Amino acid sequence: MKKLVVLLVAALAATGAASADAQKGGPVTVLTGGQGVVAPDGRVRYIALTTGRETIVSFVQLPGGQVHRWRQLPGYFGIPVIALDGTTDGVSGDGRTLVLSTPSGGVTTQFALIDTKTMRLRRVTLRGTWSYDAISPDGSVLYLIQYKELGPSLSYRVRAYDLAERRLLARPIVDAEIGERLMRGWSVTRKTTSDGRWAYTLYARAKKEPFVHALDTVRRQAYCIDLPLDLERPDQMSLRLALRADRMLEVRKGRDTVAAVDTRTLVVHKH
């Protein structure tokens, strides 16, 4: 316990560095400290603290806030940040797998996967700039964003990594109607279904309308849904998503609903 306290003090002193490093020409991809990420059942919050050389992942009970377990791992890792509004992710729908990532921008990108029951640790290392996107409900497939160009002309592909076979699947995850073109835009906000199967991400673009990227993490399929909204990019950045019980995905600007997507048919209704 004494060792844990010493490491926590050192990690708290370094908190925030990962987010700062991730902003150097690329997307914000990890969070250390802060709110961490909550398990799908709402009973545990996972918070990563790093000294730079080591990372401590605290398992915090909810409600109450007591640290009841922790996992130490070598290296600099954080909870994945998947959108500019600060949305975090990284827990599979069944709650068994927690994903952490190194900041993007290095020669390689590493991902650490912790089994939340056995505490077993696995690592995935890929050359180039990558970030976490999603994980299948059973924790068998990791979805990653492979960046081709950073900066104002940010471009990327979504790729799938089979964790059982420990290999990156050759074909990108794309909308079949669009083909294997590079995606462009900035992820603004995300909503995920309660079972962890569908991840809906709203992207802003500089000279085009915003769009929703709908990722089916079970069938390894994606759909790009253009939103008929005449908004400049700063206004697109203020949009938020809300999932209704009737499976409608609302696009909101402040308190107003400006569009809605029927997630069963992918038809967009402008308000």
Where are these regions (language model features)?
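Short glycine/acidic-enriched loop and turn motifs that connect beta-strands
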Residues: T50-E54, P103-V107, Y147-S153, A204-E209, ...
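Short coil/turn segments that connect the beta-strands within blades of beta-propeller domains
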Residues: G42-V44, D94-R96, D138-S140, D195-R197, ...
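Solenoidal tandem-repeat scaffolds enriched in leucines and small polar residues
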Residues: D133-I225
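A short beta-strand motif characteristic of beta-propeller blades
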Residues: Q23-T29, Q66-V81, M119-T125, R167-L182, ...
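Short loop/turn segments that connect beta-strands within beta-propeller blades
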Residues: L62-G65, D115-M119, D162-R166, D216-R220, ...
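Bacterial N-terminal signal peptides
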Residues: V5-T15
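Residue position within the beta-strands of beta-propeller blades
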Residues: I47, L100-S101, L144-I145, T201, ...
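Repeated scaffold domains used in trafficking and secretory/extracellular systems
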Residues: V30-P40, G75-V91, R127-D138, E177-T192, ...
